[in-house]
Amino acid sequence: MRLLVDANIFLDLFYNRGELAEISNQFLDATYDHKDVIYVAATTIKDMAYFIKRTVHDDKKTNDYLINVYGKICKIVGITDDDAISALYEDGDYEDNLLVFTCQSNMCDAIVTNNKKHFINKGVCVLTPNEYLKIRK
């Protein structure tokens, strides 16, 4: 499977948010075991850099973390002009709409997020990490 992963999955891990972090970690392990491909939008890395730097207050540590996470386990995909413009025409949150169009333009099978309600009736398959784990058992 080709999975576009929302920033909230990585934020759960970074901030060690209890059960959400555990499930997110199991999700990442399972993608590796099943040879699924994790895609992440370049804008997600930008967002993560902001949160990490705000926490660690160190550019090098921030960059090292991003390299270790995104450089090793993810394929980074860009945002096209068409994705950016199309997302503006949709109702709802721009960043969520941008993920939808990025998912479609990169032929991903699903978006993985903990906020499924943000993607209702958007025309893409959306899974929580738990749902992915159930599918892959």
Regions found by a protein language model. Name each.
Residues 1-40, 55-60, 121, 130-137:
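Short, well-structured N-terminal submotif of metal-dependent ribonuclease cores
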Residues 2, 72, 105-137:
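Acidic, PIN/NYN-like endoribonuclease modules and their adjacent C-terminal/linker elements
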Residues 6, 96, 115:
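Acidic active-site catalytic centers that drive phospho-/nucleotidyl reactions
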Residues 9-10, 44, 83, 99, ...:
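Alpha-helix capping/helix-boundary segments
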Residues 25-92, 97, 101:
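PIN-domain endoribonuclease scaffold, especially VapC-family toxins
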